[in-house]
């Protein structure tokens, strides 16, 4: 499945990124998200698969397309032949809608896919999260004090706590964790949006980020877990259940224990995981979409678990004219 579909999913995220990038800086995050969703949905139906959206833009009554449970792929076209692989898909057509709307860095189009049952059907709630790279797997505990986790990370990385950089979403709810990190002596990189990109950075040696801590969306947590499976990183996460309607949503999705701490393999247990993302705006991991007179250039990341491949793909999309020139600079 991975070999067959990885480049197909590359097309999906590229088209979503290109559509979103055309709205960059317009100040309308809803429109940016809308065009990314439309582009992703359109290309998704050209992929040779029997796909089901398990994490998307919301419930059926909340989203016109890419809603949870929606069927996508060539298998659902009229008179389609049998035999397409069954695939569960998690999507975020534009992670960082505000980033795109303001032209800020690190907006991406992203999806993860797996065989049936390979991705947790997470409700659209918040999750407490801690994300670390391969060297720190097993060293952190979601219930441990921040200082203890930072000491454990520093020990695994053979450095001082003062050498560490922790990424945290810049939100009022994170005031305590920010103070705890500072009190421990570690440095902080606050980000306005894009905790998925931050999680990937924490798992890549040389990115200058050693951990991500705080509370973010549960759908992004599952997407991050898919990336961690491919990068040998770790995410620990727990749903934030604070209202009766949250309990109802968990029950509807078959989740019985709202206090459970999920490890990476529980959020993304699949054996054939594909993770694909494409830069929309310039970022620390991926370049943004670049438009020029005769085409478009995109920069993407495609990872496959079973094949153990991490590919950075630089694509030039040329205009369909006979006199078009290819440029590499």
Task: Walk through the language-model features, giving the residues of each.
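Extended hydrophobic packing segments that form well-structured cores
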Residues: 293-329
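Flexible, acidic active-site loops/lids enriched in D/E/S/T/G that coordinate Mg2+ and/or position polar
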Residues: 33-116
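An extended, acidic
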Residues: 143-295, 299-304
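Fold-independent oxyanion-binding glycine-rich loops
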Residues: 57-58, 70, 87, 91-94, ...
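Fe-S-dependent hydro-lyases/dehydratases of central metabolism
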Residues: 18, 25, 41, 46-65, ...
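Conserved phosphate-binding loops in N-terminal lobes of ATP-dependent enzymes
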Residues: 1-38, 109-150, 154
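Catalytic, metal-anchored helix/loop core of enzyme active sites in primary metabolism
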Residues: 1-6, 16-25, 48, 58-60, ...
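Short coil/turn connectors at secondary-structure junctions
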Residues: 47-51, 81-87, 95, 103-108, ...
